[in-house]
Amino acid sequence: MSAQDKLIKPSHLITMDDIIREGNPTLRAVAKEVSLPLCDEDILLGEKMMQFLKHSQDPVMAEKLGLRAGVGLAAPQIDVSKRIIAVLVPNLPDKEGNPPKEAYSWQEVLYNPKIVSHSVQDAALSDGEGCLSVDRVVEGYVVRHARVTVDYYDKEGQQHRIKLKGYNAIVVQHEIDHINGILFYDRINAKNPFETKEELLILD
């Protein structure tokens, strides 16, 4: 039984046990494009990946299943070398602590995503980045594009083009790196992890 066959079984919930860690060669491979129209197995895998992200952000389910919270997951992280990513970016409460009207600012499974253009300006998160496949803290600015335009297919096989900036742009670049065999710390300046160039936009 392949890793994907196991993951898409109706009774299976993706947990941290399914997430492979740095050192596994799948994380360093360039993943293969999925065939269109999408097969049922690839659609199911995308749904399972999104289910994992929702569980990871739900305090009750996360504790029950022992999950670390995530806003994105790429198929190579569950040992399936395919160009599939899921993103689930939650909206935050307002300054008074009131819950947002919409739970998520972005919720999508992207098949064969590709960055087709990007800004000259770079950006990095002030607190750095983490990864479900990296069980350690790696400090430093992860330098990425401040804005990107991404082409992808949804589960219906429809093609989309979206323009992203800020945190959502960072998230999608992190996940697209995964399907290209790149880990976030590859983009940290090894000699000067917190180097700031004049044009670097630091996002809180």
Swiss-Prot record:
SUPFAM superfamilies, sorted: Peptide deformylase
Gene Ontology molecular functions: metal ion binding; peptide deformylase activity
Gene Ontology biological process terms from the UniProt entry: co-translational protein modification; translation
Record organism: Streptococcus pyogenes serotype M18 (strain MGAS8232)
Positions with a binding annotation for Fe cation: 131, 174, 178
Gene it is expressed from: def
Designated name of the protein: Peptide deformylase
Co-factor: note: Binds 1 Fe(2+) ion.
InterPro entries: Peptide_deformylase, Peptide_deformylase_sf
